[in-house]
Amino acid sequence: SGSGFSIEKMIRQVLKGIAILLALTVGTLFVFYLNRSDPWGQIPGKRLPGEAITEAIEDWSFTQQARGVTIEVRPSAPYSVNISCLFHDGAFYGLATSIENRWMQYLIQDPNIRFRVGDELYLGRATVVEDPQLVEDLFETLAQKYRGGADRTPEQKARYRFILIGSR
């Protein structure tokens, strides 16, 4: 009976240590989450750090090699996400996987954005592409760039929205 007590006590101490370690880990992650700026994977970020380039962009060809763009919407309470992007016919576009995305709702309310391509941060305005032929052309360009997706069904394509990203 004496050895059972010490094993029970040891198990309680180990469980207490695990609980403390878990609480510290969760607390640390919470602090990082609250103080983030850039988005991380699917977790949205806040205000993108850095000074934005304010000059109007005339030549968007520098975006051709970009695999993605980080876009910040809602200037009053910045909300940033990583999205796919493409260069098509001299213009720069981003892709939303759904019009229902929170960031898209913010963009519709206020088209003023900040966006980062590579290491540079820019001021811009974004508008949702409505022209059906242009949307079809953008899907073709997207399929070439990312090597896939050309076989999307019309129902799948209907969920996506392209945004034209321009200078402010």
Model-found features: residue ranges?
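Short beta-strand segments
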Residues: 63-98, 113, 125
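N-terminal amphipathic/basic-hydrophobic helices that include classical n-h-c signal peptides
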Residues: 1-9
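Hydrophobic membrane-insertion alpha-helices, especially the h-region
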Residues: 16-32
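A short linear-motif detector with a strong N-terminal bias
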Residues: 48-51, 63-65, 72, 92-94, ...
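Feature marks short, highly hydrophobic, charge-poor N-terminal signal-anchor/signal peptide-like helices
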Residues: 12-14
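Short, conserved active-site entrance elements at the starts or edges of catalytic domains
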Residues: 32-79
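Short, structured beta-strand-loop surface elements
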Residues: 38, 45-46, 56-57, 100-168
